[in-house]
Amino acid sequence: IPDTYPEGTEEDKNGNLVTPEGIVISSDGTVTLPDGTKLTPDADGKKPTVNKDETVTDTKGNTYSTDGSITDSDGNYTRPAKAVIKNVSVSKNSVKMVLNEECKGALKYDYVIGTSEDMLKTGQYTKVLKNQEELKSAFAYMDKGTWYVACHAWFKGEDGKKVFGQWSEIHKVDVSATTPQTPVISKVTVKGSTVTVKYTKSKNSQGYDVVLSDTLTKTNGQKRPAVSGENYYVKKIKGNTVTVTFKNVKSGTYYIGLHAWNCTSEDNSKTFSEWSNVRKVKMK
């Protein structure tokens, strides 16, 4: 075994050389990477080079790393590294995932979740979180059942198009909490300083939080009335009452929204629905 090969390289029963990271060097000079990529000698007989650091340089000067990244002869990335998921956890109806480390050559990441373990082949995802900078992400308001998650890194090439790294391994998780149906505001009535709100009954709901606020905020990418600002009012409803009244509301412009809740999580704490549509009212 040549001294130029990685330390620990051994010969297998077929006469191939195998490095500790799983790179296979065949007798004809073909090098097979752990992901199955084959690098072959060129027409002139020049062979790919297996380096001490477990990288492989092909006959054109491109260097392949076992982390999935590729660089050209000038050291520029032509593919970012493969994403590696460190941990996937479930909190009520939220699925959270954390990457092991930053992918070499990456600018940002796309996270996906779906109901099929074949989703990377079919491209059928339930939700996609694109263009994320952080090494962690969360999918909120997921229904009860089995879910599959994955991630890949990307950067923009000279043409401005995304260049993707390999997909991570798929991870399977189970959500045991039941997400309530999203309520819909059907009617808002203003009479003097009183605001009456009617909304639809939500399936799998045990109650509602109805908010009237002069400020909007965002939760999990959704616009909703904020429980902050100079003026806000909150009605916490237990049961299936679908009409609430806010009295003595000060003058100004307000936003109204609500979400449903139940106690189906393992710790019996509240599991929320997505926020309803937002209605705007002006109080004189």
Report each predicted region and the residues it spans.
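Proline-enriched interdomain boundary motifs that mark the N-terminal boundary
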Residues: 79-87, 178-187
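Conserved aromatic anchor
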Residues: 95-104, 195-204
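An aromatic-rich alpha-helical recognition segment common to small helix-rich domains
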Residues: 99-100, 111, 151, 199, ...
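Recognizes extended acidic, P/S/T-rich segments that occur
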Residues: 110-142, 209-249
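Extracellular fibronectin type III
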Residues: 158-177, 264-284
